[in-house]
């Protein structure tokens, strides 16, 4: 098990909406890669219990998406609190990356970070202050080399583990076709 400060922590949350002042986390997943984006380990994929009242207040997009992908049923069946999910995730990460070493990695990761700061502050503090946001490269490619955007298509299941896997593949795609490091 390679515990290494160069390893990268990838995270994705699914939430009941976009406003951390009103909405909550309903799923969390993590993956650890090496610096070359090779997956070393997948962390626990955790549905976080939330009240029916909160779930019923989700907007139409969230209701439809999280019903179709089965997440609402998993959330209702879950007994996990946000704190329990946070602790399980931290237990996993501590085996792979020292505290403060990895930037938080993912797509539109600042949104996830806002929820972590509010509801999982110990996990938020585990990351380096920097972000590795794949959506930054997507935005730059759209402006500087839009033709390469056609080469990568997402499944968009809006399940946390699937979203992380896609983010890693997307960054590898941009590394090969946009950044050309060779």
From Swiss-Prot:
Enzyme class label: hydrolase
Protein name, UniProt field: Oligoribonuclease
Active site: 129
One GO cellular component, as annotated: cytoplasm
SMART domains reported in the protein's UniProt record: EXOIII
A Pfam match: RNase_T
Keyword Nuclease tagged: yes
Lineage: Bacteria, Pseudomonadati, Pseudomonadota, Gammaproteobacteria, Pasteurellales
GO biological process: DNA metabolic process
Location of the protein in the cell: Cytoplasm
Keyword line: Cytoplasm, Exonuclease, Hydrolase, Nuclease
Gene3D superfamilies associated with the record: Ribonuclease H-like superfamily/Ribonuclease H
Annotated EC: 3.1.15.-
Family: Belongs to the oligoribonuclease family.
Signal peptide as annotated in the record: none
Protein function: 3'-to-5' exoribonuclease specific for small oligoribonucleotides.
PANTHER family reported in the protein's UniProt record: OLIGORIBONUCLEASE, MITOCHONDRIAL
Organism: Haemophilus influenzae (strain PittEE)
């Amino acid at each position: 098990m390679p515990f290494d400060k160069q390893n990268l922590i990838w995270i994705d949350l699914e939430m009941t909406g976009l406003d951390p002042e009103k909405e909550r986390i309903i799923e969390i997943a993590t993956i650890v890669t090496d610096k070359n984006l090779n997956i070393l380990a997948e962390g626990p994929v955790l549905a976080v219990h939330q009240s029916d009242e909160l779930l019923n207040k989700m907007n139409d997009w969230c209701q439809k998406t999280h019903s179709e992908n089965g997440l609402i049923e998993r959330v209702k069946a879950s007994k996990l609190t946000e704190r329990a999910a946070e602790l399980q995730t931290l237990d996993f990460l501590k085996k792979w990356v020292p505290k403060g070493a990895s930037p938080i990695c993912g797509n539109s990761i600042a949104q996830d970070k806002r929820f972590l700061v509010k509801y999982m502050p110990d996990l938020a503090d585990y990351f380096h202050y920097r972000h590795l946001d794949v959506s930054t490269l997507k935005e730059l490619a759209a402006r500087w080399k839009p033709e390469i955007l056609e080469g990568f298509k997402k499944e968009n299941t809006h399940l946390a583990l699937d979203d992380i896997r896609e983010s890693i593949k997307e960054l590898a795609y941009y590394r090969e076709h946009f950044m050309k490091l060779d």
